[in-house]
Amino acid sequence: MFTFLVPPFRVRYADTDQMGYVYYGNYARFYEIGRVEALRSLGFSYKELEASGIMMPVYENTSRYLKPARYDNLLTVAVTIPELPRARIVFQYAIRNEAGELLHTGQTTLVFQRADTGRLCAAPQGLLDHIKPFFDQQVGKT
């Protein structure tokens, strides 16, 4: 399992609805920021992946709203990749406020797809090389 913590960020006024709560559609943006930065922390980027002819469309997205995040809250997003990617990669998210309260959880599943044919493909070896050591450590603990 690999987990990455996105640096804390403040909820901006533009992120909220009339009630001062984070607008529900913005959580998907928070997820994307987390995914991109988690992969970047591994030394892997979406830009390089796309340049190599592989895309990662979202296949499934789920969200659970436990408590509202509000304007000016300081949020942290923990991003976890719970299993070694194959033809798909799963990201799990936990969003907390500055008091550490769990406000929101979510999960996205993305698939690896060849840009030229649109067909599914295996996870790129470069990504596996970067992430596999985290899963090898887990095997050693059992």
Task: Locate predicted features.
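Catalytic strand-loop segment that frames the active site of acyl-thioester-processing enzymes
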Residues: 1-38, 44
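HotDog/MaoC-like acyl-thioester-processing domains
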Residues: 3-7, 70-71, 81-142
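Generic structural detector for well-ordered beta-strands
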Residues: 8-12, 64, 109
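Alpha-helix boundary/capping residues
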Residues: 34, 46, 56, 134-138
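Hydrophobic beta-strand-centered segment that forms part of the acyl-chain substrate-binding groove
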Residues: 38-76, 80-90, 103, 111
